Amino acid sequence: MKILFSPIGNTDPWRNDRDGAMLHIVRHYQPDRVVLFFTESIWQGNQHFSGQQAFDWVKIIQSINENCQIEIKCDTIEVENDFDAYKDLFHQYLVEEKRKYPNAEIFLNVTSGTPQMETTLCLEYVTYPDKMRCIQVSTPLKTSNAKTKYAQADCQEVDLEIVNEEESQQPSRCHKIAILSFREAIVRNQIKSLLDNYDYEAALQLVASQKSFRNGKEIRKKLKELIDDIKMHRVFSYLIKQYPRNEKLQKALLHTILLEMRHQRGDIAETLIRVKSIAEYIVEQYIQKNYPYLIIYKEDKPYFNVSYSQELTESYLALMDSRNKKTNKKMTVDSLDRILGFPAYRDFLQLLEASNEMTNEMNKVNEINNLRNKVAHNLDSLNLDRDKNGRKITNAVTAVRTMLLAVFPEVQENDFHYLKQFNQSIKELL
Protein backbone atom coordinates (compact mmCIF):
# COMPACT_ATOMS: atom_id res chain seq x y z
CA MET A 1 0.00 0.00 0.00
CA LYS A 2 1.17 3.50 -0.85
CA ILE A 3 0.19 6.59 1.14
CA LEU A 4 0.88 10.20 0.17
CA PHE A 5 1.05 12.74 2.99
CA SER A 6 0.90 16.21 1.50
CA PRO A 7 0.62 19.56 3.28
CA ILE A 8 -0.80 22.26 1.02
CA GLY A 9 0.25 25.89 1.28
CA ASN A 10 -0.91 28.87 -0.72
CA THR A 11 -0.68 26.93 -3.95
CA ASP A 12 -3.15 25.44 -6.40
CA PRO A 13 -3.81 21.99 -7.82
CA TRP A 14 -1.99 23.10 -10.98
CA ARG A 15 -0.14 26.10 -12.35
CA ASN A 16 0.88 27.18 -15.83
CA ASP A 17 -1.64 24.65 -17.25
CA ARG A 18 0.40 21.81 -15.76
CA ASP A 19 0.23 19.60 -12.66
CA GLY A 20 0.99 21.04 -9.27
CA ALA A 21 3.38 19.03 -7.11
CA MET A 22 0.80 17.01 -5.16
CA LEU A 23 -1.21 16.18 -8.28
CA HIS A 24 1.96 15.23 -10.15
CA ILE A 25 2.95 12.78 -7.41
CA VAL A 26 -0.52 11.22 -7.49
CA ARG A 27 -0.31 10.88 -11.28
CA HIS A 28 3.06 9.12 -11.31
CA TYR A 29 3.01 7.11 -8.06
CA GLN A 30 -0.70 6.23 -7.96
CA PRO A 31 -1.01 6.10 -4.15
CA ASP A 32 -3.84 4.13 -2.56
CA ARG A 33 -4.45 6.85 -0.02
CA VAL A 34 -3.81 10.61 0.06
CA VAL A 35 -3.80 12.63 3.27
CA LEU A 36 -3.96 16.38 2.63
CA PHE A 37 -3.11 18.87 5.34
CA PHE A 38 -4.30 22.47 5.42
CA THR A 39 -4.06 25.11 8.07
CA GLU A 40 -7.42 26.63 8.89
CA SER A 41 -6.40 30.01 7.45
CA ILE A 42 -5.18 28.47 4.17
CA TRP A 43 -8.32 26.36 3.90
CA GLN A 44 -10.73 29.21 4.56
CA GLY A 45 -8.79 32.06 2.91
CA ASN A 46 -9.25 35.77 3.61
CA GLN A 47 -9.80 39.09 1.84
CA HIS A 48 -6.50 38.74 -0.01
CA PHE A 49 -6.88 35.20 -1.41
CA SER A 50 -9.59 32.60 -1.80
CA GLY A 51 -9.21 29.59 0.43
CA GLN A 52 -8.34 26.08 -0.71
CA GLN A 53 -11.86 24.96 0.18
CA ALA A 54 -12.88 26.51 -3.15
CA PHE A 55 -11.29 23.56 -4.95
CA ASP A 56 -12.87 20.10 -5.03
CA TRP A 57 -9.71 18.27 -3.96
CA VAL A 58 -11.36 14.85 -3.84
CA LYS A 59 -12.66 15.15 -7.39
CA ILE A 60 -9.34 16.55 -8.63
CA ILE A 61 -7.34 13.63 -7.21
CA GLN A 62 -9.83 10.96 -8.24
CA SER A 63 -9.83 12.29 -11.80
CA ILE A 64 -6.33 10.81 -11.95
CA ASN A 65 -6.71 7.90 -9.54
CA GLU A 66 -10.39 7.08 -9.16
CA ASN A 67 -9.92 4.41 -6.49
CA CYS A 68 -7.76 6.59 -4.29
CA GLN A 69 -8.94 7.20 -0.74
CA ILE A 70 -8.65 10.87 0.27
CA GLU A 71 -8.66 12.37 3.76
CA ILE A 72 -8.46 16.10 4.40
CA LYS A 73 -7.09 17.38 7.70
CA CYS A 74 -7.50 20.99 8.71
CA ASP A 75 -6.00 22.37 11.91
CA THR A 76 -5.69 25.73 13.57
CA ILE A 77 -2.03 26.77 13.81
CA GLU A 78 -1.45 29.80 16.00
CA VAL A 79 1.92 30.83 14.55
CA GLU A 80 2.03 29.48 11.01
CA ASN A 81 5.51 30.80 10.20
CA ASP A 82 7.04 29.00 13.21
CA PHE A 83 9.15 26.04 12.09
CA ASP A 84 8.26 24.15 15.30
CA ALA A 85 4.51 24.68 14.90
CA TYR A 86 3.99 21.58 12.74
CA LYS A 87 6.51 19.19 14.30
CA ASP A 88 4.33 17.34 16.81
CA LEU A 89 1.21 17.51 14.64
CA PHE A 90 2.84 16.00 11.55
CA HIS A 91 4.54 13.34 13.65
CA GLN A 92 1.21 12.43 15.23
CA TYR A 93 -0.51 12.10 11.86
CA LEU A 94 2.29 9.97 10.42
CA VAL A 95 2.35 7.70 13.46
CA GLU A 96 -1.40 7.21 13.06
CA GLU A 97 -0.93 6.24 9.40
CA LYS A 98 1.81 3.76 10.31
CA ARG A 99 -0.36 2.26 13.03
CA LYS A 100 -3.38 1.88 10.73
CA TYR A 101 -1.31 0.64 7.78
CA PRO A 102 1.87 -0.96 9.21
CA ASN A 103 3.06 -2.32 5.85
CA ALA A 104 2.45 0.85 3.88
CA GLU A 105 5.10 2.96 2.19
CA ILE A 106 4.57 6.64 2.96
CA PHE A 107 5.50 9.35 0.45
CA LEU A 108 6.11 12.81 1.88
CA ASN A 109 5.40 15.72 -0.47
CA VAL A 110 8.04 18.33 0.36
CA THR A 111 7.10 20.72 -2.46
CA SER A 112 3.47 21.82 -2.02
CA GLY A 113 3.50 23.21 1.51
CA THR A 114 4.91 26.35 3.05
CA PRO A 115 8.68 26.34 3.76
CA GLN A 116 7.89 25.59 7.41
CA MET A 117 5.75 22.58 6.47
CA GLU A 118 8.28 21.24 4.00
CA THR A 119 11.19 21.61 6.42
CA THR A 120 9.24 19.80 9.14
CA LEU A 121 8.56 16.87 6.80
CA CYS A 122 12.22 16.68 5.82
CA LEU A 123 13.23 16.53 9.48
CA GLU A 124 10.57 13.91 10.15
CA TYR A 125 12.05 11.78 7.40
CA VAL A 126 15.61 12.30 8.64
CA THR A 127 14.59 11.23 12.13
CA TYR A 128 12.22 8.37 11.21
CA PRO A 129 13.15 7.23 7.70
CA ASP A 130 11.76 3.69 7.93
CA LYS A 131 9.25 3.00 5.13
CA MET A 132 9.12 6.66 4.12
CA ARG A 133 10.31 8.63 1.08
CA CYS A 134 10.67 12.34 0.47
CA ILE A 135 9.37 13.41 -2.94
CA GLN A 136 10.35 16.72 -4.51
CA VAL A 137 8.72 17.90 -7.74
CA SER A 138 10.37 20.23 -10.23
CA THR A 139 8.34 22.98 -11.88
CA PRO A 140 7.34 22.34 -15.50
CA LEU A 141 9.97 24.77 -16.76
CA LYS A 142 12.51 23.66 -14.11
CA THR A 143 12.69 27.23 -12.91
CA SER A 144 10.82 29.46 -10.45
CA ASN A 145 7.04 29.90 -10.50
CA ALA A 146 7.23 33.62 -11.21
CA LYS A 147 4.74 34.94 -13.77
CA THR A 148 3.03 31.58 -14.15
CA LYS A 149 -0.69 31.17 -14.69
CA TYR A 150 -2.50 29.77 -11.65
CA ALA A 151 -5.64 27.68 -11.44
CA GLN A 152 -8.95 29.43 -10.97
CA ALA A 153 -11.61 27.91 -8.75
CA ASP A 154 -14.48 29.09 -10.93
CA CYS A 155 -13.25 27.17 -13.99
CA GLN A 156 -11.49 24.27 -12.32
CA GLU A 157 -13.37 21.55 -14.22
CA VAL A 158 -12.28 22.91 -17.62
CA ASP A 159 -8.74 23.54 -16.44
CA LEU A 160 -8.52 20.04 -14.90
CA GLU A 161 -9.57 18.40 -18.16
CA ILE A 162 -6.90 20.37 -20.05
CA VAL A 163 -4.22 19.59 -17.48
CA ASN A 164 -5.01 15.87 -17.46
CA GLU A 165 -4.87 15.70 -21.23
CA GLU A 166 -1.55 17.53 -21.42
CA GLU A 167 0.10 15.77 -18.48
CA SER A 168 -0.92 12.21 -19.35
CA GLN A 169 2.02 11.86 -21.77
CA GLN A 170 4.57 13.96 -19.92
CA PRO A 171 7.59 12.48 -18.09
CA SER A 172 7.75 12.52 -14.33
CA ARG A 173 9.21 15.56 -12.60
CA CYS A 174 9.35 13.74 -9.26
CA HIS A 175 12.63 13.20 -7.47
CA LYS A 176 13.17 10.97 -4.45
CA ILE A 177 15.47 12.86 -2.12
CA ALA A 178 17.28 10.91 0.60
CA ILE A 179 18.66 13.99 2.38
CA LEU A 180 21.54 11.72 3.35
CA SER A 181 23.76 14.52 4.53
CA PHE A 182 21.26 15.49 7.23
CA ARG A 183 20.55 11.89 8.18
CA GLU A 184 24.23 11.03 8.37
CA ALA A 185 24.98 14.10 10.47
CA ILE A 186 22.43 12.99 13.05
CA VAL A 187 23.68 9.40 12.98
CA ARG A 188 27.30 10.51 13.36
CA ASN A 189 26.43 12.53 16.44
CA GLN A 190 24.52 9.56 17.86
CA ILE A 191 27.51 7.29 17.28
CA LYS A 192 29.85 9.78 18.93
CA SER A 193 27.61 9.85 22.01
CA LEU A 194 27.56 6.05 22.13
CA LEU A 195 31.35 5.95 21.86
CA ASP A 196 31.70 8.44 24.71
CA ASN A 197 29.60 6.04 26.80
CA TYR A 198 31.60 3.01 25.57
CA ASP A 199 28.43 1.47 24.13
CA TYR A 200 30.19 -0.20 21.22
CA GLU A 201 27.47 -2.71 20.32
CA ALA A 202 24.85 0.02 19.91
CA ALA A 203 27.33 2.06 17.86
CA LEU A 204 27.99 -0.94 15.60
CA GLN A 205 24.26 -1.56 15.07
CA LEU A 206 23.75 2.09 14.17
CA VAL A 207 26.61 2.08 11.66
CA ALA A 208 25.42 -1.22 10.18
CA SER A 209 21.89 0.19 9.70
CA GLN A 210 23.21 2.78 7.23
CA LYS A 211 23.35 1.52 3.66
CA SER A 212 25.77 4.20 2.55
CA PHE A 213 28.10 5.60 5.19
CA ARG A 214 31.48 7.22 4.85
CA ASN A 215 34.19 4.73 5.93
CA GLY A 216 31.37 2.46 7.07
CA LYS A 217 33.15 -0.79 6.25
CA GLU A 218 36.30 0.15 8.15
CA ILE A 219 34.33 1.45 11.14
CA ARG A 220 32.27 -1.74 11.32
CA LYS A 221 35.40 -3.87 11.19
CA LYS A 222 37.13 -1.96 13.99
CA LEU A 223 34.07 -1.94 16.22
CA LYS A 224 33.43 -5.67 15.65
CA GLU A 225 37.02 -6.55 16.56
CA LEU A 226 36.89 -4.47 19.74
CA ILE A 227 33.52 -5.89 20.79
CA ASP A 228 34.79 -9.46 20.30
CA ASP A 229 37.95 -8.69 22.29
CA ILE A 230 35.94 -7.30 25.19
CA LYS A 231 33.43 -10.15 25.17
CA MET A 232 36.12 -12.84 25.02
CA HIS A 233 38.65 -11.00 27.24
CA ARG A 234 41.17 -11.12 24.43
CA VAL A 235 44.15 -8.84 24.88
CA PHE A 236 43.96 -5.88 22.50
CA SER A 237 46.45 -6.18 19.63
CA TYR A 238 47.83 -2.77 20.60
CA LEU A 239 48.82 -4.07 24.05
CA ILE A 240 50.45 -7.15 22.55
CA LYS A 241 52.57 -4.96 20.28
CA GLN A 242 53.36 -2.58 23.13
CA TYR A 243 54.48 -5.33 25.55
CA PRO A 244 55.20 -8.38 23.36
CA ARG A 245 57.14 -10.38 25.93
CA ASN A 246 55.03 -9.95 29.02
CA GLU A 247 51.76 -11.84 28.85
CA LYS A 248 50.96 -11.26 32.53
CA LEU A 249 51.30 -7.50 32.09
CA GLN A 250 49.07 -7.64 29.00
CA LYS A 251 46.33 -9.45 30.90
CA ALA A 252 46.52 -7.24 33.99
CA LEU A 253 46.48 -4.07 31.91
CA LEU A 254 43.59 -5.26 29.73
CA HIS A 255 41.39 -5.98 32.73
CA THR A 256 42.35 -2.73 34.44
CA ILE A 257 41.32 -0.82 31.29
CA LEU A 258 38.00 -2.71 31.15
CA LEU A 259 37.42 -2.14 34.86
CA GLU A 260 37.87 1.62 34.50
CA MET A 261 35.68 1.63 31.39
CA ARG A 262 32.81 -0.08 33.24
CA HIS A 263 33.19 2.29 36.15
CA GLN A 264 33.20 5.38 33.91
CA ARG A 265 30.05 4.35 32.06
CA GLY A 266 28.22 3.82 35.35
CA ASP A 267 28.16 0.01 35.42
CA ILE A 268 28.92 0.16 39.15
CA ALA A 269 27.66 -3.24 40.33
CA GLU A 270 29.68 -5.03 37.65
CA THR A 271 32.70 -2.93 38.59
CA LEU A 272 32.29 -3.92 42.24
CA ILE A 273 32.11 -7.61 41.42
CA ARG A 274 35.21 -7.57 39.21
CA VAL A 275 37.56 -5.29 41.14
CA LYS A 276 38.69 -7.84 43.76
CA SER A 277 39.59 -10.58 41.26
CA ILE A 278 41.68 -8.16 39.18
CA ALA A 279 43.42 -6.85 42.30
CA GLU A 280 44.07 -10.42 43.40
CA TYR A 281 45.78 -11.27 40.11
CA ILE A 282 47.97 -8.16 40.28
CA VAL A 283 49.02 -8.80 43.90
CA GLU A 284 49.86 -12.38 43.02
CA GLN A 285 52.26 -11.06 40.36
CA TYR A 286 53.72 -8.67 42.96
CA ILE A 287 54.43 -11.52 45.37
CA GLN A 288 55.94 -13.68 42.64
CA LYS A 289 58.19 -10.80 41.62
CA ASN A 290 59.31 -9.71 45.11
CA TYR A 291 59.02 -12.97 47.08
CA PRO A 292 59.81 -15.85 44.71
CA TYR A 293 58.76 -19.30 45.90
CA LEU A 294 56.37 -17.97 48.55
CA ILE A 295 53.57 -19.27 46.34
CA ILE A 296 53.62 -22.77 44.90
CA TYR A 297 51.11 -24.12 42.38
CA LYS A 298 49.17 -27.34 42.46
CA GLU A 299 47.09 -27.96 39.34
CA ASP A 300 47.51 -24.25 38.53
CA LYS A 301 46.06 -23.24 41.90
CA PRO A 302 48.15 -21.06 44.30
CA TYR A 303 49.15 -22.45 47.72
CA PHE A 304 51.32 -21.13 50.55
CA ASN A 305 54.79 -22.64 50.57
CA VAL A 306 55.21 -23.33 54.30
CA SER A 307 58.89 -24.07 53.64
CA TYR A 308 59.49 -20.56 52.32
CA SER A 309 60.25 -19.06 55.75
CA GLN A 310 59.78 -20.51 59.20
CA GLU A 311 59.40 -16.99 60.60
CA LEU A 312 56.65 -16.10 58.10
CA THR A 313 54.88 -19.42 58.72
CA GLU A 314 54.88 -18.89 62.48
CA SER A 315 53.74 -15.28 62.14
CA TYR A 316 50.94 -16.30 59.79
CA LEU A 317 49.78 -19.07 62.17
CA ALA A 318 49.78 -16.60 65.05
CA LEU A 319 47.71 -14.16 63.00
CA MET A 320 45.18 -16.88 62.21
CA ASP A 321 45.03 -17.92 65.87
CA SER A 322 44.37 -14.32 66.93
CA ARG A 323 41.34 -14.28 64.67
CA ASN A 324 40.06 -17.58 66.06
CA LYS A 325 40.02 -16.54 69.72
CA LYS A 326 36.30 -17.07 70.00
CA THR A 327 36.56 -20.69 68.90
CA ASN A 328 39.86 -21.43 70.66
CA LYS A 329 40.74 -23.45 67.58
CA LYS A 330 44.50 -23.67 67.08
CA MET A 331 45.85 -23.45 63.53
CA THR A 332 48.43 -25.98 62.37
CA VAL A 333 50.81 -26.07 59.44
CA ASP A 334 48.57 -28.66 57.79
CA SER A 335 45.60 -26.27 58.02
CA LEU A 336 47.50 -23.79 55.83
CA ASP A 337 47.31 -26.20 52.89
CA ARG A 338 44.50 -24.38 51.09
CA ILE A 339 44.05 -22.30 47.96
CA LEU A 340 45.16 -18.72 48.44
CA GLY A 341 43.24 -15.60 47.57
CA PHE A 342 43.22 -11.86 48.09
CA PRO A 343 42.81 -11.92 51.93
CA ALA A 344 45.80 -14.27 52.33
CA TYR A 345 47.98 -12.16 50.02
CA ARG A 346 47.06 -9.11 52.05
CA ASP A 347 48.04 -10.90 55.27
CA PHE A 348 51.40 -12.00 53.84
CA LEU A 349 52.33 -8.50 52.70
CA GLN A 350 51.29 -6.95 55.99
CA LEU A 351 53.56 -9.40 57.79
CA LEU A 352 56.42 -8.97 55.33
CA GLU A 353 56.28 -5.25 54.63
CA ALA A 354 54.18 -3.71 57.39
CA SER A 355 52.90 -0.46 55.82
CA ASN A 356 53.80 0.41 52.24
CA GLU A 357 52.11 1.52 49.03
CA MET A 358 50.93 -1.94 48.02
CA THR A 359 49.33 -2.84 51.35
CA ASN A 360 47.71 0.60 51.57
CA GLU A 361 46.10 0.12 48.17
CA MET A 362 45.06 -3.43 49.03
CA ASN A 363 43.24 -2.06 52.08
CA LYS A 364 41.12 0.12 49.77
CA VAL A 365 40.06 -2.96 47.83
CA ASN A 366 39.52 -4.97 51.01
CA GLU A 367 37.27 -2.20 52.34
CA ILE A 368 34.58 -3.08 49.79
CA ASN A 369 34.94 -6.87 50.13
CA ASN A 370 31.87 -7.35 52.33
CA LEU A 371 29.81 -5.16 50.01
CA ARG A 372 31.07 -7.14 47.03
CA ASN A 373 30.10 -10.46 48.64
CA LYS A 374 26.58 -9.21 49.34
CA VAL A 375 26.10 -8.15 45.72
CA ALA A 376 27.92 -11.08 44.11
CA HIS A 377 26.80 -13.94 46.35
CA ASN A 378 23.60 -12.77 48.04
CA LEU A 379 22.40 -10.94 44.90
CA ASP A 380 21.69 -7.84 46.97
CA SER A 381 21.01 -4.52 45.28
CA LEU A 382 23.65 -1.81 45.51
CA ASN A 383 23.08 1.40 47.47
CA LEU A 384 25.81 3.91 46.64
CA ASP A 385 24.65 6.47 49.18
CA ARG A 386 24.90 4.15 52.17
CA ASP A 387 28.22 4.12 54.08
CA LYS A 388 29.88 6.13 51.31
CA ASN A 389 29.84 3.04 49.07
CA GLY A 390 30.21 5.07 45.87
CA ARG A 391 33.39 6.72 47.07
CA LYS A 392 34.79 3.42 48.37
CA ILE A 393 34.25 1.72 44.99
CA THR A 394 35.94 4.64 43.20
CA ASN A 395 38.89 4.38 45.61
CA ALA A 396 39.17 0.63 44.93
CA VAL A 397 39.20 1.17 41.15
CA THR A 398 41.92 3.81 41.51
CA ALA A 399 43.86 1.45 43.80
CA VAL A 400 43.95 -1.24 41.11
CA ARG A 401 45.75 1.09 38.73
CA THR A 402 48.27 2.11 41.42
CA MET A 403 48.91 -1.55 42.26
CA LEU A 404 49.40 -2.38 38.59
CA LEU A 405 52.02 0.35 38.24
CA ALA A 406 53.80 -0.93 41.36
CA VAL A 407 54.16 -4.35 39.73
CA PHE A 408 54.71 -3.19 36.16
CA PRO A 409 56.28 0.30 36.29
CA GLU A 410 57.02 0.14 32.55
CA VAL A 411 53.32 0.66 31.75
CA GLN A 412 52.76 4.03 30.07
CA GLU A 413 50.04 6.41 31.25
CA ASN A 414 48.58 6.61 27.73
CA ASP A 415 47.92 2.87 27.76
CA PHE A 416 45.19 3.33 30.35
CA HIS A 417 43.42 5.64 27.88
CA TYR A 418 43.47 3.12 25.04
CA LEU A 419 39.66 3.07 24.67
CA LYS A 420 39.48 6.87 24.52
CA GLN A 421 42.14 6.79 21.81
CA PHE A 422 40.15 4.10 20.00
CA ASN A 423 37.03 6.27 20.25
CA GLN A 424 38.90 9.20 18.79
CA SER A 425 40.11 7.11 15.86
CA ILE A 426 36.51 6.14 15.05
CA LYS A 427 35.36 9.75 15.34
CA GLU A 428 38.04 10.76 12.85
CA LEU A 429 36.77 8.13 10.41
CA LEU A 430 33.27 9.54 10.88
Swiss-Prot record:
Keyword terms? Antiviral defense, Endonuclease, Hydrolase, Nuclease
- Record keyword Hydrolase present: yes
Listed EC numbers = 3.1.-.-
How is the activity of this chain controlled?
Answer: Non-specific ssRNase activity is allosterically activated by cyclic hexaadenylate (cA6) binding to its CARF domain. cA6 is a second messenger produced by Cas10 of the ternary Csm effector complex in the presence of a cognate target RNA.
Q: Where is this region: HEPN domain?
A: 156-430
An annotated Gene Ontology molecular function: endonuclease activity
Please, which domain of life does this record's source organism belong to? Bacteria
Its top-level enzyme class, in one word, is hydrolase
- GO biological process: one example: defense response to virus
Q: Region (CARF domain) spans which residues?
A: 1-155
Indicate the family of this protein. Answer: Belongs to the CRISPR-associated Csm6 family.
Query: What is recorded about the protein's domains?
Result: The N-terminal CRISPR-associated Rossman fold (CARF) probably binds the cA6 effector. ssRNase activity resides in the C-terminal HEPN domain.
Task performed by this protein? CRISPR (clustered regularly interspaced short palindromic repeat) is an adaptive immune system that provides protection against mobile genetic elements (viruses, transposable elements and conjugative plasmids). CRISPR clusters contain spacers, sequences complementary to antecedent mobile elements, and target invading nucleic acids. CRISPR clusters are transcribed and processed into CRISPR RNA (crRNA). A single-strand-specific endoribonuclease (ssRNase). Activity is stimulated by cyclic oligoadenylates (cOA); maximal stimulation is seen with cyclic hexaadenylate (cA6).
Quote additional remarks: Encoded in a type III-A CRISPR locus.
Q: Assembly state and interactors?
A: Homodimer; the composite ssRNase active site is formed at the dimer interface.
Protein known as: CRISPR system endoribonuclease Csm6
Q: Which organism is it from?
A: Enterococcus italicus (strain DSM 15952 / CCUG 50447 / LMG 22039 / TP 1.5)
- Per UniProt, what is the name of the gene that codes for the protein in this document? csm6
